[in-house]
Amino acid sequence: VNAVTLGGSLYWVDMVGNRTAPVIFGPRRVVLLAGRNKIVDTQADAERRVQQIAGPKNVARHTGFRTPCAVTGLCADCNSPQRICNSRVWLERCYPAGL
């Protein structure tokens, strides 16, 4: 999870969806842990957190990536083939409820 809103929405940004798909279509029960640093007020704050903090930190772990955020540390909403933020997922609630 890249961010969690105070309203309970979970937000992920991923390169190919390998971190989001298992949560959506995977096992019957999934346990997610998120640190206090990922809690934000609104969905706009969640998107801002990913662009300004999580995205640049994540791409920095991948040596050899030359996206604008890897070079400058700031999201440029690029169109690079190495772009790590291709899929965006908002999880509002689970269905059926209680699982």
Where in this protein do the model-derived segments appear?
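Conserved phosphate- and dinucleotide-binding cores of soluble alpha/beta proteins
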Residues: V1-L99
